Amino acid sequence: MLMSFILLISTSMILISVFSYVLIALIVLGIVLSLISLLSPRVSYVSSVYLIGLTVYLNPGFSLTQSLINTVPILGEINMLSGLLKTPVTSIISSLFSLALLNLGIKGYEIYLSKHADIVKLDSIIFSQHGLPKQANWNIVVNSEVKLLKSNEKLILSNTPEAKYELCPTLVDHKYYVPNKVTGLAFEGEVIRINYSPVDGVPYEKFRNCFTVFEVEGLPPDTSFVIEINGASLKLKDRKFAKLSLEPLYWKVNEIRISREDEEEIYEPDIKEGLTFRGGTVKINFRRKVIRYKTAKIPSIENWDPGIWVGQEVYGYRVIEVIGLGGNGYVMKVEKNGLLYAMKVLSVNKFTNSLEHFDNLLKESENLEKLSKDPRLVSIYGSFVDKNNIQSALAGDYTSYYKYPPAIIMEFMEGGTLFDLISRVDLVQSKYWQYIVKLVIKEIAKALTFLHKRGYVHLDVKPQNIFLKEKINGEPEVVYKILSSTPGIIKLGDLGSAVRVGEKITQATPAYSPPEQIEAVITGKGAQPSMDNYALGVTLYKLLTMKNLDYVNYLDKAFDEYIKGDPSIAMKYINMAKMSMVNFKPKLPHNTLPELANVVQGTLVVDPKRRLTSYDIVKILEG
């Protein structure tokens, strides 16, 4: 009995320390009634009624619907229980517990009695979830702000008079769990319990604001399509599907090709990419287009005629004409959506390392596109390389090469190539020609410096790959003035031949390649910037003399022998070319500008380490 009295007195002192003096008398009366209930259990009824009334009076959040239902009854119920049991122990426990709950009420708390036993401050709102797997997270939008929470985590909002909330399903292990509420309004002092339950299917109809809906039209039945959403690719057949996401969705879809015997169906989306937000609808309409292939016999890749593509569509580009032929491919003028482009189709050769070259191109295509943004390089807009089609072509299926050739889409250069300018006798024989040549070589040297600093070797520098952005007509003086006053008019093209420094070389143009480049094709040695510097020197020599180098014949024979499959004889010709270079002294026109002569002599040397760098060439020509 004494211990009970001490406990009650201690509790009362704690309560008195936080109450005002006005309330002391009321509290003391409650304690007295509790003590009397220890001696006479019947007094428990009186004590219960008193404590209930006191709690209701002191609870600042009292309302008939909340306090009577949630807060008040516990005091009376426990105290009444002690009276019914008629035991002093239950009276002590009930009195202490009643006073503790009374203290919480006075401090501004509401007591919610249930299996969850929540106690919430009157100026707070609590959100909790039940029903999700332990590993799952959940989210709730409160006053337009998304809150991300762990499975067992509650959301407690303090000093919030009211909260407008919205709930969405949660996807766990490919299964949707839906909440029992969609939207609502909560007020301070409330506990909002959200119950999740699993459902079959995608519940986007009920929770429309939580999903982005994609609707696809125009495709044949059972035709799959691939859509990329936030970097993840999905292969689908459904014409209507929904994506659950809290964040914006960036989506992208490509055209679909269906091949027939002598034609190909192309289904092109009216919108290829976009950014959407949840609650939105994206409609993608595919338009059908049929390409009918020529029924003429398709030539073998060894005797390929690029003219077979003229008038046809390749990768959605209409081929207008063939504008260039080379040892490693064909260049065609193409059109798409009213704009002109150049398409280079790479040749496939059974006797060279074609697949390895295409592997490198596929791997480096994105980097080369970025590099081509330099104003002195012809821009690359895209590349199409499918190793399976190349293998089929090498195995004799030439239709694969006809329909899906390895191709690079490039900026179309209206002015043609530097090689075209050589045909103008009046220009070449004029006093302005050397200055035009100096200007061109300096710009290409700057382009090579840019590539070399970024770890790439071009490997195919020659007049045919030096382009003019605009057509230039007029007298030699006019041509020189236009070239010298128009930035970006002179560009180095065909970046598709470029590889990283040190990587294997699979191709070469003997007339412009140094001996060690052809040797590297045979032996597998890596590419070096000095190969480009030599090729630029040969280009300069060609522009000044209109002649090929004396020892080029050896390099041509070396490459021919390699193609025939006899590398040992090829190496003999390469060594003969190197010996000729040791004693080679370039014969230039007597009036050649000294700086141009220095570049020729400094680049056409047999030892790659002694050659001028592209940066050296720029300095010489700018000095």
Swiss-Prot record:
PROSITE patterns in UniProt: PROTEIN_KINASE_ATP, PROTEIN_KINASE_DOM, PROTEIN_KINASE_ST
Q: What induces it?
A: Induced during starvation conditions.
Q: Which UniProt keywords apply?
A: ATP-binding, Cell membrane, Kinase, Membrane, Nucleotide-binding, Phosphoprotein, Serine/threonine-protein kinase, Stress response, Transferase, Transmembrane, Transmembrane helix
Q: Which residues bind ATP?
A: I323, G324, L325, G326, G327, N328, G329, Y330, V331, K344
Q: Does the keyword Membrane feature in the UniProt annotation?
A: yes
Coiled coil residues, start to end: none
Its topology with respect to the membrane? Answer: Multi-pass membrane protein
Instruction: Report the top EC class in one word.
Output: transferase
Catalytic activity, EC: 2.7.11.1
Relay the activity regulation note: Autophosphorylation is stimulated by Mn(2+).
Q: Which residues form the active site?
A: D460 (proton acceptor)
Major location, coarse class? membrane
Residue stretches spanning the membrane: 13-33, 49-69
Name the GO cellular-component terms: cytoplasm; plasma membrane
What does this gene product do?
Answer: Plays an essential role in the controlled expression of archaellum components during starvation-induced motility. May inhibit arnR transcription and promote ArnR translation.
Put simply, this protein is called Serine/threonine-protein kinase ArnS
Gene behind this protein: arnS
